[in-house]
Each structure stands twice: as structure tokens, then as C-alpha cells.
């Protein structure tokens, strides 16, 4: 009998073991679709980004007009740009839902998979930030100025570090060219890290909504979950194309229709919606270094989540108190996102400070506390 090429070929068997014959729990829900959706987001962003890069010029005098030229004169350039800009938003929607799923179902107990995931999140955030600067509009320029300036809060080396990052004494041409370089490079780094992320995941196999070992009841990934993934792709690409075609500027900042001007500061400097929660935490501390540390902690705190798991059950499926706390955290992040978009004045200042405090309290104190309490309740 001739050997099955799919199972014997050195390259094909790797693909087979990852996407075709992969043993998968039979009860994973739609919340497990977001991994593959993130893959589709990455592929879409790399494809549209490559086409945009072919028409883009990374120079302060030409960047803005080169983007305008792409939208006006390049065949379907407007569509490529709109898909790329809004694709970033969908990338973040998917990654936040993916992380939320991981938190709710205790997937963070696969420590290596979780940690590589956080590194992926940080790389994605860096990519989105440098990409936002490229069209060289007002908010691009001032966003870059404000955020890079935060590094100057680092004691002793701060100012040197910022000037080194800028390539001068302010955000200027060298900054733009290096940001373009980074924006081109980082997505491929994300693709590489994704493979590491998947390698770690396939060491243990997928978690499932019950949080129990599912080895006794696993099914092949194809055709069951491959079909389910295709449905997910359709449900992702439909709203993306709808947004890109009907309301492409809905999530953008009107300031970016004005070319960058170092002499005029916009009245309200704010990042894209997906960074607003972190921006609100940064602004809630009236001290530069303190704010920067809180900003870093708001994302890096995810590294501590596996250490703070005190429950005897893995998932929150049968833990109503933890569920309540989880949805409180979601509401809290929504409040932070809203506060980040508001001006720094009463009552937004105090709301932001309280929401920031609540964010860290829930993650660092209340989750382990409630987990321990639920264990005690189970014993009685």
C-alpha cells in the first residue's frame, strides 16, 4: 500500500497534525474561533499593507499626499486603505475577545501559550502605534510625540532614549522612516510568534468550556472545526467590509484629515479606540513616571494572571461569583475606554481614577479572593 503523502511528507505532515488530524475537544464553543480569526486578520493586514506600502512614501513632505494619492488615483486604493485601517480595529476586537475567553475559561493555566500570547499582544500594540503615525496627519504626529515622550520619564537614561528613538530632537523625518521600517517588519514577527504560540498550544491541546481533560472525547479538526472556522471568517469579513465600504472613517480621528503641523497642537490628543483604556489609566495618575508605570502595568499584569488563580476549578462556568466579577471587569474596561476619549476635566478625572483603581483591584485582589471563597463554599 502506498504511503499517505499527507501523513508522510515532512512538510505536509506538520500541516496535517496542526490543521487536519488535530485531536480537538468536541465541546469547544464559538469563543474558540477567535484564534483563527486573528490569523485571518493578520493575513488580511499583511496583504492590504503590502499593497499600500507599494504606493506609500515615508517622507514628511510626501507621506500625507502619498496616502491621498493612493485613495484618489490607485485602482481600488481607497478600498485597500479602508480595509487596512478598519482591519486594525477588528484585529483588536478579536484579540480582546480572545484574551477575555482565556480569562473566563482559565486558558491561562497553559502558561507558555498564555505568555507568548501576551508578547503577541504587545507586538500588535507596537505595530498599530507605529502604523498610526504613517499617514502623517495631525493626530498621527501628536500621538507619536506624546507617546514617545513618555520614555523620557525613565530616570537617568530617559531623555537620551527618546532622542535616540526620534533620531533627532523632535518627531521628524528620521522618526517617520524608522516607524515605516518597524511597521513593515513587526507583522512578520507577529506571524513568527504565532507559530510559537501554536506550537505551545499543540503541546497540551485545546482547553474547553468545562475545563476538564477532554482526551476521552476528541474529534478531528477537519471537517468539523475547519467548517466552523469558515463560518467565523464570513462573520468577521462581513462587518469589516460593511464598515470599510459604508462608514470607513467612523473609528478614525477627524484631525488626521489635516496634515501634521508641529506648530499647532490639536485641542484633544487621544489614541485610537483600542488604546483608550490604557490611555485613561496613564492619565489617571498626576505624575509622569507613575502614569507610565501604570500604563505598562495595565497590560503586563496579564503575566501575573496564572499565579493569581486560586480556584480548584479551572473555568468560571460553574463559578457564579467569579462570573459576576469577570463581567464587572468588562464593564470597568468599557468605562475606562469611554474616559480615555473624554477631556481631562471634572467629573472625568475622578471617574478615570476610580476605574483605574478598580481595574487593578479586581485583577490583583478580588479574583484570587473570590476563588478562595468559592473553594471554601464547595467544602461545606
UniProtKB/Swiss-Prot annotation:
Keywords: Electron transport, Heme, Iron, Membrane, Metal-binding, Mitochondrion, Mitochondrion inner membrane, Respiratory chain, Transmembrane, Transmembrane helix, Transport, Ubiquinone. InterPro entries: Cyt_b/b6_C, Cyt_b/b6_C_sf, Cyt_b/b6_N, Cytb/b6-like_sf, Cytochrome_b, Cytochrome_b_C_euk/bac, Cytochrome_b_N_euk/bac, Di-haem_cyt_TM. The keyword Electron transport applies. Its main location: mitochondrion. One of its GO terms (cellular component) is mitochondrial inner membrane. It holds the Pfam family Cytochrom_B_C. GO terms for molecular function: metal ion binding; ubiquinol-cytochrome-c reductase activity. Heme b b562 binds at residues 84, 183. Gene3D superfamilies: Cytochrome Bc1 Complex, Chain C. It is found in: Mitochondrion inner membrane. It is a multi-pass membrane protein. The cytochrome bc1 complex contains 11 subunits: 3 respiratory subunits (MT-CYB, CYC1 and UQCRFS1), 2 core proteins (UQCRC1 and UQCRC2) and 6 low-molecular weight proteins (UQCRH/QCR6, UQCRB/QCR7, UQCRQ/QCR8, UQCR10/QCR9, UQCR11/QCR10 and a cleavage product of UQCRFS1). This cytochrome bc1 complex then forms a dimer. This is Cytochrome b.
Amino acid at each position: 500500500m502506498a504511503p499517505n503523502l499527507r501523513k508522510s511528507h515532512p512538510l505536509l505532515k506538520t500541516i496535517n497534525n496542526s490543521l487536519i488530524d488535530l485531536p480537538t475537544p468536541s465541546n469547544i464553543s464559538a469563543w474558540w474561533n477567535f484564534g483563527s480569526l486573528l490569523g485571518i486578520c493578520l493575513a488580511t493586514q499583511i496583504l492590504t499593507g503590502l499593497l499600500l506600502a507599494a504606493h506609500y512614501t515615508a517622507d514628511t513632505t510626501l507621506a500625507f499626499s502619498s496616502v491621498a494619492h493612493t485613495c484618489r488615483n490607485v485602482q481600488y486604493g481607497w478600498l485597500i486603505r479602508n480595509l487596512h485601517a478598519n482591519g486594525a480595529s477588528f484585529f483588536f476586537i478579536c484579540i480582546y475577545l480572545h484574551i477575555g475567553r482565556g480569562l473566563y475559561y482559565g486558558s491561562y493555566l497553559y502558561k507558555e501559550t498564555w505568555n507568548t500570547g501576551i508578547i503577541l499582544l504587545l507586538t500588535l500594540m507596537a505595530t498599530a502605534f507605529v502604523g498610526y503615525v504613517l499617514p502623517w496627519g495631525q493626530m498621527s504626529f501628536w500621538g507619536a510625540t506624546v507617546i514617545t515622550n513618555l520614555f523620557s520619564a525613565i530616570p537617568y537614561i530617559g531623555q537620551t532614549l527618546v532622542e535616540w528613538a526620534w533620531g533627532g530632537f523632535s518627531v521628524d523625518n528620521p522618526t517617520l522612516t524608522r516607524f515605516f521600517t518597524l511597521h513593515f517588519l513587526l507583522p512578520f514577527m507577529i506571524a513568527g510568534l504565532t507559530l510559537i504560540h501554536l506550537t505551545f498550544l499543540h503541546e497540551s491541546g485545546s482547553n474547553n468550556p468545562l475545563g476538564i481533560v477532554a482526551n476521552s472525547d476528541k474529534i478531528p479538526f477537519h471537517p468539523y472545526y475547519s467548517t466552523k472556522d469558515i463560518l467565523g471568517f464570513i462573520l468577521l469579513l462581513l462587518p469589516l467590509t460593511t464598515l470599510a465600504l459604508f462608514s470607513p472613517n467612523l473609528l478614525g480621528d477627524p484631525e488626521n484629515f489635516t496634515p501634521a503641523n508641529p506648530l499647532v497642537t490639536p485641542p484633544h490628543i487621544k489614541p485610537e479606540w483600542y488604546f483608550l483604556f490604557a490611555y485613561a489609566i496613564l492619565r489617571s495618575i498626576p505624575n509622569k513616571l507613575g502614569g507610565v508605570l501604570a500604563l505598562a502595568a495595565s497590560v503586563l499584569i496579564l503575566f501575573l494572571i496564572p499565579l493569581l488563580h486560586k480556584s480548584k476549578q479551572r473555568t468560571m462556568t460553574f463559578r457564579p461569583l467569579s462570573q459576576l466579577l469577570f463581567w464587572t471587569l468588562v464593564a470597568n474596561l468599557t468605562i475606562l475606554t469611554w474616559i480615555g476619549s473624554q477631556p481631562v476635566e471634572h467629573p472625568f478625572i475622578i471617574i478615570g481614577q476610580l476605574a483605574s483603581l478598580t481595574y487593578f483591584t479586581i485583577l490583583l485582589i478580588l479574583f484570587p479572593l473570590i476563588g478562595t471563597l468559592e473553594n471554601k463554599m464547595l467544602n461545606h
